[in-house]
C-alpha cells in the first residue's frame, strides 16, 4: 500500500461472512505493507489453572494476568490473547496484523520426458509466504449458542477439566470466543502437481 486517503495511515475492513463477525475488522490496509493483511488478536492458547487462584469455589485471575475486556468472569479453558500494549486488559487496542494474504512468491514449472515411445509431461505450481484465514474453524471449533452445528473432530480435544493442557477453548459461549485471532490463521503455501500427461 503506497497511499490511502489524506491523513489516513490505515484502513480496516470487515469480512461479511457471518453476523457475529460483521462488525469486526478482519483485514487492514496499511501504508508500507502489502494488501490483504489479516487483522485481529494474537492467540496465546487457553487460560490454565495456574493463571488463577481459588477463592472458595471461584477462580480469580492472578495479578498481572490480562483479561478480555468484555468478559465478566474469565475461567480456565477460555481463550487467552496477547496484551500487546501491556495495560492488563485485552481490548481492541491489542489487535494487530496476524497474517499475510498475498504470497511472497508464486510460480510454476513444466517438464517433458520421452523414453522408448512414451512421453510424460508434468506441470507443478506453487505459492509461498501467504496465509489463509480458516473461517470454518471459527464455527466448527467453537461453541456458539446461536447455532446448532456439528463440530470438527479436533473439537473433541478441547479444554476440559480432564484435558487441562488443551489450547482449543472450552465449550462455553463467551465474547472472547467470538473474535478473529491468529488461532485460525494457517500457512497457505503450497506446491501442487497441476497436470500430468502420459502418452505413447
Show where each model-derived region lies:
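Flexible glycine/proline-enriched surface loops and loop-helix/loop-strand junctions
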Residues: 103-104, 181
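Low-complexity, intrinsically disordered short peptide segments enriched in small/polar/basic residues
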Residues: 25, 57, 111, 165-167
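Conserved small-residue
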Residues: 1-99
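Outer-membrane beta-barrel domain signature
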Residues: 96-100, 184-187
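Transmembrane beta-barrel strand/turn architecture of Gram-negative outer membrane proteins
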Residues: 1-43, 105-142, 196, 200
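Extracytoplasmic gating/loop element in the C-terminal half of outer-membrane beta-barrel translocons
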Residues: 76, 127-200
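Secondary-structure capping and boundary motifs in well-ordered enzyme cores
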Residues: 89, 103, 189-190
